[in-house]
Amino acid sequence: MSTSTGSRVADDSHLRAQHLQKSYGSRTVVKDVSLSVQKGEVVGLLGPNGAGKTTSFYMIVGLVRSDGGGIQMDGQDVTHMPIHRRSRLGLSYLPQEASIFRRLNVEDNVRAVLELQTDESGRPLTRDAIEQRLTDLLHELRVEHLRASPALALSGGERRRVEIARALATQPRFILLDEPFAGIDPIAVIEIQRIIGFLKKRGIGVLITDHNVRETLGICDHAFIINEGRVLAQGTPSHIVNNAEVRRVYLGEHFKM
């Protein structure tokens, strides 16, 4: 699959975690978590505080080493790979905290990532190719009008869009979003949901963990609910919302989408 900015996603692309386990001392926080993300699929990883969802997410990202189980990306075992090697294989991670260069403007933030990329033959991108991809990304993420704006002047929603543009500059197969709806206003939430839909249309698999349940379920194709270190339930948002056990331990009886 190709796009105007050069993203290439394999037809059989998938990210899969199987039987993940993690303990800290005598406390086991992740007992048995398995999940998968296919190309062009938006998956939510949700659950109560302390359930093990964040630790599971960080194991998939590569920030936390698993004690058991495995992680595969497009059939390749990445369980013990550090985050930078997973990134080279096509896994992009957007942390909750600001990840843009605060002293650069918007276009230089994206250009800095593009200058590290190579073409299909492994050669550095030409200046013309960099500038074309830069223009395409700024347009697609609707930040073209901000290209000369300093990063420090961006709102929370604008910053998120620039961060996603930077992530797309690496031509990822999967993007893992940590709390993408945190600290932004309702209008920006709608814009982030639109962008996630845009990633899906590009064939990129998206894994989201967030405390904002409605916003996350509102964009997901599939969700996994983690409780007490295990997968309590999985399925479509409708299935999750109507699951009696999920309502009892997580959503509450009066939850509505």
Q: Which stretches of residues belong to each language-model region?
A:
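Conserved ABC ATPase signature
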Residues: P150-L154, E158
